Amino acid sequence: MKTLIRKLTRTAITLVLVILAFIAIFRAWVYYTESPWTRDARFSADVVAIAPDVAGLITNVNVHDNQLVKKGQVLFTIDQPRYQKALAEAEADVAYYSVLAQEKRQEASRRNRLGVQAMSREEIDQANNVLQTVLHQLAKAQATRDLAKLDLERTVIRAPADGWVTNLNVYTGEFITRGSTAVALVKQNTFYVLAYMEETKLEGVRPGYRAEITPLGSNRVLKGTVDSIAAGVTNASSTRDAKGMATIDSNLEWVRLAQRVPVRIRLDAQPENLWPAGTTATVVVTGKDDRDESQDSFFRKMAHRLREFG
């Protein structure tokens, strides 16, 4: 009898442990697959593609690749003598037409004052027409001068904002054309995270919700807030025009093919250049408040660890 009871007890304990293990695994799996999180996230930042507005030989490069620069700092300079001569020529034209306009204005004023008693109406009208023509030529010369001055100013390419120079591909002595990208500037204090959430997890994502960001290969957890959710995406397999919307390739996970939607996350603190734009991270949306790790159950902690491998 005692032997039977011991066998039943062991069987019951084993059964209870199996049930508890199944429940634990099931809860961890549900939390792992259905909670709002993703490993497909990227650090991003505002990037300015810097291109000159004038063409010419590069005479001086004042920065090096990946250098932190300040707004207004000179990046490189394009050969200036050609534009200085163009400005001098334009200023000479303005001076010439200014003198000529003054002469024609005096002539027209004199003829208008004398009137038809001293000369014909045709001669008076002709003087007025010549004056208007010279004034138009003066205005054109002034516009050409202003444009030449602007071109000369733009031979010096400056940083439009504080940030890091990256992908610098210009060198002294090279000829650069107007509008060709010379360098990219990653603007300082503009870093954010784009988390590509599966559509099945968007129910737990709302603007204002808190988020945890773990950069790949780091144990450091950054805090942030959901800033916005993309209003539309297009499927990469679609033949229709995306009309400017983000094109996201769907990942095949098990047998479900869920579309992913970009979620923009505003960082509480800027990481500077520690994690460059384009690097990956894991993002967990914790809800309206930050997650209190001290209150996490064993199952929840295990689910968080599973994310590092899934």
Swiss-Prot record:
Q: Provide the transmembrane region boundaries.
A: 12-32
Where does the UniProt entry say this protein principally localizes?
Answer: membrane
As for subcellular location, the record says:
Cell inner membrane
Write the gene name: aaeA
Any Pfam family matching the protein: HlyD_D23
- What is the membrane topology noted in the UniProt record heading this document? Single-pass membrane protein
Q: Which family does it belong to?
A: Belongs to the membrane fusion protein (MFP) (TC 8.A.1) family.
Any one GO CC term of this protein is: plasma membrane
* Keyword Membrane attached: yes
What PANTHER family does UniProt report for this protein, alphabetically?
Answer: P-HYDROXYBENZOIC ACID EFFLUX PUMP SUBUNIT AAEA, P-HYDROXYBENZOIC ACID EFFLUX PUMP SUBUNIT AAEA-RELATED
| UniProt-recorded name of the protein | p-hydroxybenzoic acid efflux pump subunit AaeA
Q: What does this protein do?
A: Forms an efflux pump with AaeB.
Q: Which organism is it from?
A: Escherichia fergusonii (strain ATCC 35469 / DSM 13698 / CCUG 18766 / IAM 14443 / JCM 21226 / LMG 7866 / NBRC 102419 / NCTC 12128 / CDC 0568-73)
Its induction note reads:
Positively coregulated with aaeB and aaeX by AaeR.
Alphabetized UniProt keyword annotations: Cell inner membrane, Cell membrane, Membrane, Transmembrane, Transmembrane helix, Transport
Domain of life, per the record?
Bacteria
Cite the GO molecular-function annotations of the record.
Answer: transmembrane transporter activity
